From Swiss-Prot:
Gene (UniProt): rpsQ
Family annotation (Pfam families): Ribosomal_S17
Transmembrane parts of this sequence: none
GO molecular function: rRNA binding; structural constituent of ribosome
Protein name as it appears in the record: Small ribosomal subunit protein uS17
PANTHER family (alphabetical): 40S RIBOSOMAL PROTEIN S11 FAMILY MEMBER, SMALL RIBOSOMAL SUBUNIT PROTEIN US17M
């Protein structure tokens, strides 16, 4: 099964080796046909503590690291 990959903005980096990423999704309302934005926050593993608030990052699913952390930061060559 492929792992999900999402893109979002870092909203918190206060924890050690953990960042909170806010992911925004857009969808069309079934009845009113208006586009709606919804956001969700994910705790992601940042091994090197290199990402700061406001950074645009990509995260992917992984095996559970702690109770709330099941995502890790994807390190691309572009970053």
């Amino acid at each position: 099964m492929p792992k999900r990959i999402m893109q979002g903005v870092v909203v918190s980096d206060k924890m050690d080796k953990t960042i909170v990423v806010q992911v925004e999704r857009r969808f069309k309302h079934a009845v009113y046909k208006k586009f709606i934005k919804r956001t969700k926050k994910f705790a992601a593993h940042d091994e090197l503590n290199q990402f700061k608030i406001g950074d645009l990052v990509r995260i992917r699913e992984c095996a559970p690291i702690s109770r709330r952390k099941t995502w890790e930061v994807v390190l691309d060559n572009a970053e």
